[in-house]
């Protein structure tokens, strides 16, 4: 199985996750979308030195993953390429902010180290929340929720088509890669001299498939906007749960929970 085929399997696995049954899966897509956006907004609003307060924001995605029946390590495995890049964003902070702001024993910790860790945590937490939304909500439900928020139909249609038909492009890449390796057995990867013709053939084959798909869509009455199937029935408990979670998130942001807990036991 080549890399393109593995990527197709990854996409199918995401669809299987979204088709699971759990309290999180059964929530209204719009409530999940708004709650995720609210969580991300609150997470990034923490001060760059407030690492203790930010740490408690981890409780919400971890609890939601358990409630959804999805292992947390699944998120880290699926995003194994993106997460290191997010962590790398703040690597240079210790070189620019060298002021000592706290001590661990006799060891001084600079503000750059704290801000680096805070920035990494913000990125990881936001990725975890975003992945949970995609893993518990189908792309059709997400696009329908976006249309309910009056997002432009062009953007929602583009998002849906990109997600749905990226697998078609990957299938073409897999077929062409396999054909290339049959003609060049034992060669690792595709030689640089063949990159131009390979990409050109991929473009032509993709255009042919795209034209055939668009003609099929037109025959089925498509004229610029998808008509999404009826969403889940309105569930007041879904919105109640989302409001409770949003309130807890806001309380975590407004009050220093670690300091309050420390004052109770001191």
Descriptions of predicted regions:
Residues 1-49, 53-68, 171-266:
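Transmembrane alpha-helix interface motif
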Residues 21, 25, 69-74, 103, ...:
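Membrane-helix interfacial "entry" motifs
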Residues 53, 71-79:
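Interfacial helix-loop-helix linkers and transmembrane-helix boundary segments
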Residues 50, 71-72, 152-155:
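Membrane-helix interface segments
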Residues 76-185:
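Juxtamembrane/interface alpha-helical elements of multi-pass membrane proteins
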Residues 73, 164, 215:
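Short alpha-helical basic/polar micro-motif
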């Amino acid at each position: 199985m080549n890399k393109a085929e593995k990527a197709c399997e990854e996409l199918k696995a995401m669809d299987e996750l979204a088709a699971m049954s759990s309290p999180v899966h059964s929530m209204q897509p719009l409530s999940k979308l708004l709650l995720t956006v609210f969580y991300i907004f609150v997470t990034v609003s923490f001060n760059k030195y407030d690492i203790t307060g930010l740490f408690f924001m981890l409780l919400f995605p971890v609890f939601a993953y358990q409630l959804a029946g999805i292992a947390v390590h699944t998120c880290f495995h699926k995003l194994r390429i993106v997460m290191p890049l997010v962590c790398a964003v703040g690597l240079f902070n210790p070189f620019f902010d060298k002021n000592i702001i706290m001590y661990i024993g006799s060891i001084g910790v600079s503000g750059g180290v704290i801000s680096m860790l805070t920035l990494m945590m913000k990125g990881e937490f936001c990725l975890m929340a975003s992945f949970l939304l995609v893993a518990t909500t189908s792309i059709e439900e997400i696009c329908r929720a976006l249309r309910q928020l009056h997002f432009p139909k062009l953007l929602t249609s583009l998002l849906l088509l990109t997600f749905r038909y990226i697998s078609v492009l990957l299938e073409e890449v897999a077929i062409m890669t396999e054909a290339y390796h049959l003609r060049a057995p034992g060669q690792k990867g595709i030689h640089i001299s063949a990159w131009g013709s390979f990409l050109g053939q991929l473009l032509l084959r993709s255009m042919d498939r795209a034209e055939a798909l668009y003609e099929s869509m037109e025959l089925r009455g498509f004229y610029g906007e998808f008509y999404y199937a009826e969403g889940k029935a309105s569930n007041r408990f879904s919105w109640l749960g989302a409001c409770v979670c949003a309130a807890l998130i806001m309380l975590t942001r407004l009050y220093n929970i670690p300091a309050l807990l420390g004052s109770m036991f001191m």
